[in-house]
Amino acid sequence: MNRNEILFDRAKAIIPGGVNSPVRAFGSVGGVPRFIKKAEGAYVWDENGTRYTDYVGSWGPAIVGHAHPEVVEAVREAALGGLSFGAPTEGEIAIAEQIAEIMPSVERLRLVSSGTEATMTAIRLARGFTGRDKIIKFEGCYHGHSDSLLVKAGSGLLTFGNPSSAGVPADFTKHTLVLEYNNIAQLEEAFAQSGDEIACVIVEPFVGNMNLVRPTEAFVKALRGLTEKHGAVLIYDEVMTGFRVALGGAQSLHGITPDLTTMGKVIGGGMPLAAFGGRKDIMECISPLAGVYQAGTLSGNPIAVAAGLKTLEIIQREGFYENLTALTQRLANGIAAAKAHGIEFAADSVGGMFGLYFAAHVPRNYADMARSNIDAFKRFFHGMLDRGIAFGPSAYEAGFVSAAHTPELIDETVAVAVEVFKAMAA
């Protein structure tokens, strides 16, 4: 009896779509989602008892591996002291200090419970600071599900965006301009036309939601230069990349100092925790110091903070990122080398994050990614899953390696990929 099928049917009878986040439903790959019963190290087990080598990593947070004993113990100790207080704690000061020490761009920081809250508030803060309404985002970049950011590109080069979700009024998105990622000419034209109306530019400094896409060095410099020139706020959305691609996030690799940074995933160690921070003069526009409002009952939850503090301690140990980066490169390069004749395939990685593309080349923007062979990805995904390897159930999602993976485990994964590619080419 397949417990996954039974649970999915049961879930669909009470939870819309049977899941609490759409990608989990396997809608883009077909089949029945795996209901996870437990996780440890580099593995997850479904309700049938089947073990999978996991490259989803809870979509990024599990950088030290699942159920790391030190993180679990930190959570246990914190829970014994109470689950939630709705009051300030020393732990939230400590984690803010830790993050600020690691990321010099963060002069002040506020904790929240989700990446969506972080980006939503960063946008509000940028608008409050500048007194402007318009924002720029890039096609294929995901910044959570707040109304002003659920926007797809308009029909013309520099038209303001249209809602990408039902239930979002057009008036909410009329101030959002959607441009092509890595397109400097569009960015320059947008500022030439509307520079004194643009409050901020929000960007994934390495994109993870149209698979892994790198920015060009020139694009990064243009982002910083144009926002500075026109008095707009540059927001680095490092919810995914923060502490994942490098200890100091993407901004440390780019040599860029953003005005605001949003972060999440890794900083909670697997618990619901996120943050936004940056320049003191911008951050001090927020309540209770000034008029930009933000609040949250569970913001700075002591259990999540305890998990985050222990995770931050672990990832700062000697050799952590060198090992993580080497493992991730070994995986990406190994799978790319394993591709069968006649199958277009490319791979890339940065830090502990990787992208697998059924395309001739690594994509540079959403249009490139949209031209990849989605049907081939579906076959690859299920071929790997049936053999005990779990990747994200969408061609548009990046993958993640943890410190719990080993070279031997990576090589086993590559060997399975060889089998799957051969089956696909047959």
Swiss-Prot record:
- Molecular function terms, GO-annotated: glutamate-1-semialdehyde 2,1-aminomutase activity; pyridoxal phosphate binding; transaminase activity
One GO term under biological process is:
protoporphyrinogen IX biosynthetic process
Q: What is its EC number?
A: 5.4.3.8
Q: Which organism is it from?
A: Neisseria gonorrhoeae (strain NCCP11945)
**How does it associate, per the subunit comment?**
Homodimer.
Which family, according to the similarity comment?
Answer: Belongs to the class-III pyridoxal-phosphate-dependent aminotransferase family. HemL subfamily.
| One cellular component term from this protein's GO annotations in UniProt | cytoplasm
Q: Which InterPro entries match?
A: 4pyrrol_synth_GluAld_NH2Trfase, Aminotrans_3, Aminotrans_3_PPA_site, PyrdxlP-dep_Trfase, PyrdxlP-dep_Trfase_major, PyrdxlP-dep_Trfase_small
Sorted UniProt keywords: Cytoplasm, Isomerase, Porphyrin biosynthesis, Pyridoxal phosphate
The protein depicted here goes by the name: Glutamate-1-semialdehyde 2,1-aminomutase
- Which reaction is the catalytic activity of this chain? (S)-4-amino-5-oxopentanoate = 5-aminolevulinate
Cofactor(s) required, per the database record: pyridoxal 5'-phosphate
Top-rank taxon of the source lineage equals: Bacteria
**What pathway does this protein act in?**
Porphyrin-containing compound metabolism; protoporphyrin-IX biosynthesis; 5-aminolevulinate from L-glutamyl-tRNA(Glu): step 2/2
The major lineage groups are: Bacteria, Pseudomonadati, Pseudomonadota, Betaproteobacteria, Neisseriales
Modification N6-(pyridoxal phosphate)lysine, positions:
K265
Q: What subcellular locations does the record give?
A: Cytoplasm
